[in-house]
Swiss-Prot record:
GO molecular function terms listed in the Swiss-Prot or TrEMBL record: structural constituent of ribosome
GO cellular component assignments: cytosolic large ribosomal subunit
NCBIfam families listed in its UniProt record: L17
One GO BP annotation of this record: translation
Keywords of the record: Ribonucleoprotein, Ribosomal protein
Protein's recorded name: Large ribosomal subunit protein bL17
The family this protein is said to belong to: Belongs to the bacterial ribosomal protein bL17 family.
Superkingdom of origin organism: Bacteria
Stretches of the chain forming a coiled coil according to its record: none
Subunit record text: Part of the 50S ribosomal subunit. Contacts protein L32.
């Protein structure tokens, strides 16, 4: 019986699921925009939102908490130097999930996950 079990299993073991979401968090922190399936995007919110909240206060203990989940020095560095100060005034809701159609092959619903307040890169070559 699965009473009071929250979250999805994605037909993976717990260690595989933990590694998958750790890698997805690192990719989102590095690129600030990723494309994945809709259920994974919805579950990714449970992992990335607390990480960004922890990164608002830059201390050794909070860096260690983030590294325990991410296992990537570069991702932790960007999280605390760029994203923490960027979201300092925002009380939550750090990511946006946008539905973007269905995947060819298995027709899985896809979504784009992006960080809010992402800097827009403009093309100045047109002028």
């Amino acid at each position: 019986m699965r009473h009071r079990n929250s979250g999805r299993s994605f037909s993976r073991t717990s260690s595989h699921r933990k590694a998958m979401f750790s890698n997805m968090c690192c990719s989102l922190i590095e690129h600030e925009l990723i494309r994945t399936t809709l259920p994974k995007a919805k579950d990714l919110r449970r992992y990335i939102e607390p990480l960004i909240t922890v990164s608002k206060s830059d201390s050794v203990a909070s860096r260690r908490r983030a590294f325990d989940i991410l296992r990537s020095k570069s991702a932790v560095g960007k999280l605390f130097t760029d994203l923490g100060p960027r979201f300092a005034k925002r009380p939550g809701g750090y990511i946006r999930i946008i539905k973007c159609g269905y995947r060819d092959g298995d027709n899985a619903p896809m979504a784009i996950v992006e960080l809010m307040d992402r800097p827009v890169i403009s093309d100045d070559t047109e002028e």
